[in-house]
Amino acid sequence: MSAAGAAAGAPRLRSLDGLRGAAALVVVVHHALLLFPALAGVYYAGRRAEVLPPFADALAYSPLHLVWAGTESVYLFFVLSGLVLTLPVLARPGFDWLAYYPRRLVRLYGPVVAAVLLGALTILLVPRSNDDLFGTWVVRRPNAYTLEALVDDLTLVAGTSGRISPLWSLQWEVLFSLLLPVYLLLLVPARRLDGWRAAALVALCAVGAATSTQTLFYLPIFALGVLTALNWRTLEDRAQRWTAGRRWAWPLVLVVAVLLTTARWNLTGLGVDPPLASRLAFLALPGVWLLVVAAAFCPALRALCETAFLQWAGRVSFSLYLVHEPILLAARFLTAPASPWLAIALGVPVAVVVAVLFERLVESRFHRLAQRVGRAVKARRRVAQEA
């Protein structure tokens, strides 16, 4: 991400690495808290399914939901993907699309294949159960891999099996990666209309949320990242001008970002009918977009995202995202008679260690392989042209 940003003249993308790391940690917290049946009931019911202790109630139905807003963190990943994949295209005249496709697919599918095999191994070694005592989220995880489920998880584009639930987002990552030239063809012309087009993208997400049409909901989120890349310098200039001399400006932006990102849960807590609140989930899109902008241009948040810890989290974020959930579930089944806190205490450190190893031994190697594949395609193309 940082290299892509440098290539496009956007040197502050290092802070977005840290933001991505923070979002990955939020996803881990999200799945850890879903081990508690009461919070899993909140997540699936979207309402006060039962009386919660005050702090748990605040975690569920207030802006504090941000600390375990796993779904909204995935929206942030989608915006970042649109931004990061577009910047190198804009920076290089005559961008080599023939090299891009194999490079991108190796980069995505290599770690996914390894993660699926690891997840299948955890299911084999630690059998799963559908006992109601585990709560809704755990019970909804299938107990075994079938051949059909394995094919779904290894190919992604037709949907995933739910054995490793974070894989659902990779379906949309792959589709967006394949459709990136189409996004650019649609969004690069008529740049003066970008404000209207951003509003139209949010409107499409609203329609997708209202009609439960996943394509209409998810694919426009990537487009907002593409528009952000197209207007990067303009956004930076406007952010500097608008916040100059206004100490309250960035705090206000961050408050609005958090309120929008958690809007569905805040509204539920205020008594809004849960089905209506779920249809307002699209409000998280402008919220996570504001977080991306703030991480790039707000000095305080940028400094936080550039700390060593969040930079490390950003480096292992993809690996952590892929491997953590089967490990947490295995820890819960191994400690079934005890509180979910014990599963969290055991599972989270193991997941972090496995993620670090996975990043070094799997993800980084496929990243290097993807670069070699891209260079090989370019070299063959040059040879063919010279011949």
Range-by-range predicted roles:
Residues P63, V253-R365:
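Alpha-helical transmembrane segments of multi-pass integral membrane proteins
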Residues T86-P93, T122-P127, Y183-R192, V226-D237, ...:
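Structural signal for the C-terminal ends of transmembrane alpha-helices
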Residues A45-A69, L108-V174, L178, L283-A295:
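Membrane-interface helix-loop-helix regions
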Residues R14-L90, V112, S317:
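Functionally critical transmembrane alpha-helices in membrane proteins and complexes, commonly lining
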Residues V174-A203, L230-R246:
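Solvent-exposed interhelical
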Residues P11-R14, S62-V74, S161-W172, G208-L224, ...:
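Interfacial loop-to-helix transition and helix-capping segments at the boundaries
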Residues M1-S15:
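Short, Lys/Arg-rich, polar N-terminal cytosolic tail immediately upstream
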Residues L19-R20, A69-S81, L85-R128, W137, ...:
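Transmembrane alpha-helical segments and their boundary/interface "anchor" motifs
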